[in-house]
């Protein structure tokens, strides 16, 4: 192995030995805090105050109006600038262009003008003041008049007032008014407004037309009110009017979004066939989208094959939906075959087609290939859009390739593709993970200048970034600021909070937030369960994790690849290797789909448990499915081979890194140094360290600890102290592992006086010795037969650390007595 392996990176040393310097040259080097150039403790890694200040400043809270519909119905966030952006009507019947306005009588024209002249905040009071006049007016014509004149928001506020009056018994709503209202809000995509107001209307008392019912079904689907949609659909079939093809497509969408409803979807399809309704592209794409959400690859392929066998010719929309199935699962080979079939059938690919291909590559770990799709699209005359770029940027961020992500972001802007809020959120997330707060602030400003104000998802991103141990107070603060800026939590927010508290190690807060979520009217979904699993994975509580999985299944939810990945993490953290094996066997038996993420987690779980055989099996399984390992996988395999002295296999991993065109990172070189240290070639390890110091990959604490460990194992304590001095000169503070390595080295050499120097140095530098520190010293005395010295050392532990645990001292004293008696 030589420098040719990675020609553009720090070369590996070719020197096999380096004679130690003469002892006389090292006499002056002594372990002492006076010889160490310790830097001050690092500041907090995430300066939240400054970042939060900018986010609050840039966030524009949604307007609140005490007398508007939004005040009584928080979901009624319709446009509030209509009074300034729309001209006030001075309606003259004879020259009005809108046909419906010509039908208004003079009294109704005056009323329309009066409504238009009122500020939105004063509409409720105005309606109350002209209540008797409104009740004598043709309300259908009045609502149409407001809508046709461009003031649909005022028509909605009028309808809201009518609903309140109807509930108080002052009037009976006309079914035509409801139909017009539903059409207006459907046209304007105001589904949450529609769903909120419709909850106040006893729909069972009205018979509406099929178009209105279909729009209401769509509103329920968009707002997650699936049970209401299903009840309404069943009532339509029982009472009329008969559902149309569009209605059936909407109810298919309802079942697809609701989840765990594949049999019901098949039942709806059979019902459509029995009524002679021919499937269109929306039917097919909706069914395939349902498969994508649930990971139903086999069902999707069977449904698509059946369609074609019946003579159906898929169009771009249907093919895109099929691509989404494979894209979500990361099965890029199937996605490529779909793209090939489209070309063979002369079916034009659009930006959505390529976006799904990008998603497939990303899910399979091929971020470079995903970026290559952008060039492919351009050559074929299809311009990549914000979704395309955002998907790849997010993939780079998750792979730890922040610089590539930022480079692509700026290339996106240069190409004339305007980033959207999702793009900025992805960039903010990857910058936050690396604590690059100054760049985050610049990105927030850039976001605002491009007309993308921070939204709820931006705040959710900020909450997620606070999910580190000990940062639960920061989570609380960000959540308070989020609400003060007018962003009420949605289900995604609650899921993010549960996950963030879990990562902070605050399982109590995570459970509390789950309770708040249900009280707020949000039902748990797969993401919620995964957030709970994430909290349990941090603690290794695999028993509770298994209960969560059982609860999911009992409620009809199908655990996803994320669910099983988190269970693997639970087992790994909890040391339950048999649990890892059970999931591995289910994957091999075909019960769980072997996605890129799941197999990657399987390998990492085995690595965490130091299970060599399990890691090798997972690595073989990973490559068997055609997935591309990332540097985390390669580094894990390199490390476990090194730990087990399997140097030929370790060199094979290094060769695979080169063949895959990947760049070794600092973790790779740290593992390589560890390999040399384990072989006793500490000088080679130092050569790599010296080369790293001159490269862009600057050595870290692990790098120096590894070389120090090598020298200590060889008894070259003066060289180890020299490395420690160089480390601190570079601004890297030693940790407990560093000090314990010196204790171990001095103990092996019988240099007990120096050990006390190390412990005193630890105390001076705010690094408390742990039980292992003292245990190594006690064992060293015992091995040397110095039992009385060992007991003397135990008796003065409190002088080194007055807060050291009494039970630990008793255990150490017992250890000395047991050694003496053996």
Curated annotation (Swiss-Prot):
* Listed PROSITE patterns: PPR
PPR repeat residue intervals: 209-243, 244-279, 280-314, 315-349, 350-384, 385-419, 420-454, 455-489, 490-524, 525-559, 560-594, 595-629, 630-664, 665-699, 700-734, 735-769, 770-800
Start-end of Pro residues biased regions: 8-22
Ranges for the region named Disordered are: 1-42
Tell me which GO cellular component terms the UniProt record holds: chloroplast
What main location does UniProt list?
Answer: plastid
| InterPro entries for the chain | Pentatricopeptide_rpt, PPR_P_subfamily, TPR-like_helical_dom_sf, TPR_rpt
**Subcellular location field:** Plastid, Chloroplast
Location of the transit peptide in the chain: 1-77
Q: Where is the composition biased (Low complexity)?
A: 23-37
Keywords for this protein: Chloroplast, Plastid, Repeat, Transit peptide
Q: Which GO terms label this protein's molecular function in UniProt?
A: mRNA binding
> Which NCBIfam families does UniProt cross-reference here?
PPR (TIGR00756)
For this chain, the family text in UniProt reads: Belongs to the PPR family. P subfamily.
Name under which the protein is recorded? Pentatricopeptide repeat-containing protein At2g18940, chloroplastic
Q: Which organism is it from?
A: Arabidopsis thaliana (Mouse-ear cress)
Organism phylogeny: Eukaryota, Viridiplantae, Streptophyta, Embryophyta, Tracheophyta
